């Protein structure tokens, strides 16, 4: 039922593959066991599932998850998600994806095409719509950055990689004790840098 096709990338907590699941093209994230920080590995796996029951056009959808398959000595679990391609906003902004390299005669002058105002507005609206939905469900992403915004072939932005996310319980968001230091330091929210509580 699940067949891994090719690697798409890897990060601190695992690897992502293009795969097929019941005949549909999907992305599979295998969360690896960390010998250095086992608790962080487990927390990352379960944090990814914060969005498991949610469906929104601007959020990468979780299809299934398992702590058993595919069996691997080094894997904590597997998360099967909708396949949205492997182009991110990071590729678009910094011209790091081969798909976005346009040559030397472009507006950016660095082998990449500058974003048009229309693209910038559309991408911003997609991201804000996705964030508003997540916040309405009590979920804060905590690692929002261009590399975690995927762009589909149709040009729709989808928020992904919820390994640092946190589900705020009813009334808990007002607690001064709810703060998280996960995520990418250079993209961390100002309130977290100041040691304040998480806000949605």
Curated annotation (Swiss-Prot):
It holds the Pfam family Pkinase. Keywords: ATP-binding, Kinase, Nucleotide-binding, Serine/threonine-protein kinase, Transferase. It comes from the Eukaryota. One of its GO terms (molecular function) is protein serine/threonine kinase activity. The active site is at residue 143. Signal peptide: none annotated. SMART domains: S_TKc. This is Serine/threonine-protein kinase mos. It comes from Gymnogyps californianus.
């Amino acid at each position: 039922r699940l067949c891994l096709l090719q690697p798409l990338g890897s990060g601190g907590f695992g690897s992502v593959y293009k795969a097929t699941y019941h005949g549909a093209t999907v992305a599979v994230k295998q969360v690896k066991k960390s010998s250095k920080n086992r608790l962080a590995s487990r927390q990352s796996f379960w944090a990814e599932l914060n969005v498991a029951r949610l469906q929104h056009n601007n959020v990468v959808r979780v299809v299934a998850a398992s702590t058993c398959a595919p069996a691997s000595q080094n894997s904590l679990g597997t998360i099967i998600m909708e396949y949205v391609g492997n182009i991110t906003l990071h590729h678009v902004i910094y011209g790091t994806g081969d798909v976005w390299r346009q040559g030397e005669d472009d507006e950016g002058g660095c082998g990449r095409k500058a974003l048009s105002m229309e693209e910038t507005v559309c991408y911003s609206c997609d991201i804000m719509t996705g964030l508003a939905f997540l916040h309405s469900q009590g979920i804060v992403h905590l690692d929002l950055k261009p590399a975690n915004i995927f762009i589909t072939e149709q040009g729709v932005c989808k928020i992904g990689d919820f390994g640092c996310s946190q589900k705020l319980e009813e009334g808990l968001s007002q607690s001064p004790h709810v703060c998280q230091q996960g995520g990418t330091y250079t993209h961390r929210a100002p309130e977290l840098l100041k040691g304040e509580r998480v806000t949605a």
